[in-house]
Amino acid sequence: MQQKRREPVQAVQVFGRKKTATAVAYCKRGNGLLKVNGRPLEQIEPKVLQYKLQEPLLLLGKEKFAGVDIRVRVSGGGHVAQIYAIRQAISKALVAFYQKYVDEASKKEIKDILVQYDRTLLVGDPRRCEPKKFGGPGARARYQKSYR
């Protein structure tokens, strides 16, 4: 009885973050499938945010995405923060996949194109919400002071 050997799946798992939104992208060999929370990119509303998500695809061209399937899970944050987290996760996943399974030259080419267009596609934005302090309604604003 001969056992079939299954070759390991070529896949990478990468996350993208913006404020409190976290997107986890799972990228494996495939045929150009791109889904966010189980839905295709075309179903994302409003259209303005959909265009933001398509930036990595438009920059690199469809042929770079043709050989991979990317599935993204996203949670936390607001609509815009989630979109930025997703586009970062997609970009980082593609770079990581090309580094691990394709070749270093094409990975560097992809990385250079993305960084030249918008650095936040690969590098996280460190800005966070400042905590509120006592003596005022917000982080910096103070309550009004009266002298008489």
Swiss-Prot record:
GO biological process assignments: cytoplasmic translation; maturation of SSU-rRNA from tricistronic rRNA transcript (SSU-rRNA, 5.8S rRNA, LSU-rRNA)
An MF annotation (GO) of this entry: structural constituent of ribosome
Classification via Pfam families: Ribosomal_S9
Classification via InterPro entries: Ribosomal_Su5_D2-typ_SF, Ribosomal_uS9, Ribosomal_uS9_CS, Ribsml_uS5_D2-typ_fold_subgr
Ribonucleoprotein among keywords: yes
Residues in the signal sequence: none
This protein's UniProt keywords: Ribonucleoprotein, Ribosomal protein
GO cellular component, one term: cytosolic ribosome
Top-level division of the source organism's lineage: Eukaryota
Family: Belongs to the universal ribosomal protein uS9 family.
NCBIfam families for the chain: PRK00474.1
Alphabetized PANTHER family for the sequence: RIBOSOMAL PROTEIN S16, RIBOSOMAL PROTEIN S9
Name of the protein: Small ribosomal subunit protein uS9
Organism: Drosophila melanogaster
